[in-house]
Amino acid sequence: MKYQAKVIKKYEKLGYYVIDLVVTNKKGIADLLCLKKGEVPLFVEVKDIGDTIKPLQRYRAKELQDLGFESIFDINKKR
C-alpha cells in the first residue's frame, strides 16, 4: 500500500472526511484536505521516503496557516 493511502486511512480512523486534492488551481498546495465537524480544516502534505518538501510547499502551508487553517507535513520515516 502506498504511503498516501495509509495516511488517508489514518485520518479517516480519526474521524476526518478526507479529500485527495489531485488537481488544484494552485501549485504547491497540500495533497489532502481533512474535514471534521467543529474543527478547523486540516491540509496535509504527504511525503514518502526520499521525497523532499519544496520551498513552494512550505510557502503554501504558511499561506494556509495565515488564513486560519491547519497545514502540516506527514513524512514517512519508516524504511
Q: How should each PLM-predicted stretch be described?
A:
Residues 1-79:
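Catalytic phosphate/metal-binding cores of nucleic-acid and nucleotide-processing enzymes, i.e., regions
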